[in-house]
Amino acid sequence: MNRKFLPLVLVCLAFCAGAARAAFINGQNYAPLADWAGANGFRIIWPAHNEVVLTNRTSRLVFGVDSAQAEINGVNVRLSFPAAKDRTGALIAQFDLDTAIRPLLSPSHYVEQKKITTICLDPGHGGKDSGNRVGFHYEKNYTLPLAFEVRDQLKKLGFKVILTRSTDTFVDLPVRPAIANSRGADLFVSLHFNAAQSGRDEVSGPETYCITPVGASSSNAQGEGGDYGPTTANRFGNKSLLLAYQMEKSLVQNLGAEDRGVRRARFAVLRDAAMPAILIEGGYMTSPVEGKKIYDASYRKQMASAIVKGILNYQRLSGPVLSPAATGMSTVIKVKTPG
């Protein structure tokens, strides 16, 4: 063989070997986790049959086979597609590497250093729309005072705050992000409380939603009509993910609550927001324990403080959010097995 063609042949063999190990599952390209781990300096361990752990000097990632539920530095994050496994090892959807893992590991590549001055708070429901109802408790009656408390704390820190409603009035869903857009808000935060189906009063904990990536199904797909196309909010998708991550992390840590995770949805109040936007479900009114807390003003004040801390943590992003120097702890990314 001509020596000058040998490097080209070796490159081709290496590329073909990598391509052969890739997989196409349910319409998605999956990458061998071992290849991605090696390229990013991770060591792989299999502590259980359906769980794979990736570690390096600063980070720890755990993926569960057939699970889309991830845990990142102690915070649950729902992936768009489940991790998989073949005879060569674990596989991860390239889509999730691009839209979740990479942004969360390297936020400085996705968030420019822009000063946040104006925040739009959206107290969920109002007027004829009472939201969730548990006994004589209506969701709309708790989202508004929570918004007032968050507003007051933010204003003390020098932020300008916009409310989509300040009384018990009905505001159409599309109008809410329109208010934020017209007033030049830097962030949009919609405030809600959750309710579980009958017989599931054990469910508790906050959830934080951001816009679903284009082409993926939502964690909560109700009312989306199968439209997976781009929205205005998708222009800010990575920033919204990072805001949601910091918010969920702050809520769980500061409230000592069960972590229901960062999730994706095309909620009407998120779709048209022309800035990073999230929707917070602050807890479950149907939980006998958590419900009583939600109805208590002192707990809502504590929750408001956690929300403010989440916003401040997002604002401070200037390097890897999972840097030990920044967090004082090692990175954890975890995907649990179903059940």
For the regions a language model picked out, list residue spans one by one:
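A broad, structure-centric signal for solvent-exposed, well-ordered loop/edge residues
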Residues: L8, G38, L61, A70, ...
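Active-site-proximal helix/loop segments of hydrolytic enzymes
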Residues: H137-G339
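Sterically constrained small-residue positions within well-ordered secondary structures
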Residues: L13, Y110-E112, G199, R271
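Bacterial N-terminal signal peptides
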Residues: P7-C16
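Enrichment for repetitive, rod-forming helical segments
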Residues: L10-V11, N132, R183, I307
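Intrinsically disordered, low-complexity segments enriched in glycine/proline and serine/threonine
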Residues: L6-P7, K156
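Primary recognition of N-terminal secretory signal peptides and signal-anchoring hydrophobic helices
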Residues: A19-G135, P145, Q153, L157, ...
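Positively charged n-region of N-terminal signal peptides that target proteins for export
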Residues: M1-F5
